Amino acid sequence: MNRNPDQNTLPNITLKIIETYLGRIPSVNEYHMLKLQARNIQKITVFNKDIFVSLVKKNKKRFFSDVDTSASEIKDRILSYFSKQTQTYNIGKLFTIIELQSVLVTTYTDILGVLTIKAPNVISSKISYNVTSMEELARDMLNSMNVAVIDKAKVMGRHNVSSLVKNVNKLMEEYLRRHNKSCICYGSYSLYLINPNIRYGDIDILQTNSRTFLIDLAFLIKFITGNNIILSKIPYLRNYMVIKDENDNHIIDSFNIRQDTMNVVPKIFIDNIYIVDPTFQLLNMIKMFSQIDRLEDLSKDPEKFNARMATMLEYVRYTHGIVFDGTRNNMPMKCIIDENNRIVTVTTKDYFSFKKCLVYLDENVLSSDILDLNADTSCDFESVTNSVYLIHDNIMYTYFSNTILLSDKGKVHEISARGLCAHILLYQMLTSGEYKQCLSDLLNSMMNRDKIPIYSHTERDKKPGRHGFINIEKDIIVF
């Protein structure tokens, strides 16, 4: 039987807090389930909604001025959400409402509200790069890798983009400046800051408080547009979340990383924004081309990749003094694949202190083998490299998340060989190791190459797990 709690036997203060929040006397079950949330509930109850409404209106005026909605509509949506618990009787939904309201109450002002106040002066820190001089070289390199055969019968996943992306991009530009210790960008927008001729869509970010930021942003969009916003977590992308609207249109995504990982990511400072060092991004692009899907993307739009590649090549030429004369020495390093055990052995003794690198194509197998080694010095760089690295007895152990292309039976394609070398160089950059000679040889090994057809490729590691999501409208959190 669901009875009201006896006010004589229950702590009066806690009961009053819950009663005020729910707008009704809680049932016995509600009281006992919610009493440990009393502190959070009290913060929500005393939260100044008028100031919050003002901040959202200012965010709307600055970043969403073209969205047709009135100030009164925004206020009504906010007040409606902060009173939603009064019409909710499901305990699970009440917990979700409390959790999400708590995020808004405790973080919104510092994360998004701060974007409405006067910004610090922008420190102009751009260098003029002669990207044009690298365009022909980039085109030659990419042409030799343009070997994917497109299967016209293959159904490609559609990536529908929301019309709000341009508004969110405007907000993100300011966010990256205000929060440049906890949020950095990479990808097309970061290269656009170096070369304004680069085209970009949404802004790719790494940050240390991704979940909180995305929840705050989702509510901002909800309060301004009235649309239901859903946050999704993808199991095979590590610490990745994406915001989509109710029609499954992509708005923005983000990878979350630890602060200690953020501290070691190579980065440069441009106009008050930190971007991932283009040298590091170039290595990631070389690694990425081992993925068969990315080669298909290259085949569809080579000029898009050419602009990015030329920009990064010019950056490394200018920054590291790389001479592009075709001197490749021992690059790419020798790679031997064991297809049965799904391990590639890379001979590294010509460049590094460890003599070889065992590259696992199954992450769980690597984790098991590291445990067997009883070694506790592995480095986990999360989504920055999608792998741990361990050096033990002059052997590096690591995981490679992409496909391995083969040019013949049992023979690693040179595109994948370079991708594996780039993966090792990412570790060298992250740990402040030596990489410049190896980088020079790797880039020169991409010059003047003929196209080599793909014989076959290994499959990617299958990632376990389920999709998670936060549905604001339905008060559901599944993670």
UniProtKB/Swiss-Prot annotation:
This is Poly(A) polymerase catalytic subunit. Polymerase that creates the 3'-poly(A) tail of mRNA's. The keyword Nucleotide-binding applies. Belongs to the poxviridae poly(A) polymerase catalytic subunit family. Ca(2+) 1 binds at residues 202, 204. It catalyses: RNA(n) + ATP = RNA(n)-3'-adenine ribonucleotide + diphosphate. Its EC number is 2.7.7.19. It holds the Pfam family Pox_polyA_pol. GO terms for molecular function: ATP binding; metal ion binding; poly(A) RNA polymerase activity. The gene is OPG063. CDD domains: polyA_pol_Pox (cd20919). It comes from the Viruses. Heterodimer of a large (catalytic) subunit and a small (regulatory) subunit. One of its GO terms (biological process) is mRNA processing. Ca(2+) 2 binds at residues 202, 204, 253. Keywords: ATP-binding, Calcium, Early protein, Metal-binding, mRNA processing, Nucleotide-binding, Transcription, Transferase. It comes from Cowpox virus (strain Brighton Red) (CPV).
